[in-house]
């Protein structure tokens, strides 16, 4: 779960 402005679904 990462809150990164960009949209990284890893």
UniProtKB/Swiss-Prot annotation:
Belongs to the cytochrome c oxidase VIIa family. Keywords: Membrane, Mitochondrion, Mitochondrion inner membrane, Oxidoreductase, Transmembrane, Transmembrane helix. It is found in: Mitochondrion inner membrane. Its main location: mitochondrion. GO terms for cellular component: mitochondrial inner membrane. Component of the cytochrome c oxidase, the last enzyme in the mitochondrial electron transport chain which drives oxidative phosphorylation. The respiratory chain contains 3 multisubunit complexes succinate dehydrogenase (complex II, CII), ubiquinol-cytochrome c oxidoreductase (cytochrome b-c1 complex, complex III, CIII) and cytochrome c oxidase (complex IV, CIV), that cooperate to transfer electrons derived from NADH and succinate to molecular oxygen, creating an electrochemical gradient over the inner membrane that drives transmembrane transport and the ATP synthase. One of its GO terms (biological process) is oxidative phosphorylation. It comes from the Eukaryota. The keyword NADP does not apply. GO terms for molecular function: oxidoreductase activity. It is a single-pass membrane protein. Component of the cytochrome c oxidase (complex IV, CIV), a multisubunit enzyme composed of 14 subunits. The complex is composed of a catalytic core of 3 subunits MT-CO1, MT-CO2 and MT-CO3, encoded in the mitochondrial DNA, and 11 supernumerary subunits COX4I, COX5A, COX5B, COX6A, COX6B, COX6C, COX7A, COX7B, COX7C, COX8 and NDUFA4, which are encoded in the nuclear genome. Pathway: Energy metabolism; oxidative phosphorylation. This is Cytochrome c oxidase subunit 7A-heart, mitochondrial.
């Amino acid at each position: 779960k990462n809150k990164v402005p960009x949209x990284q679904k890893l």
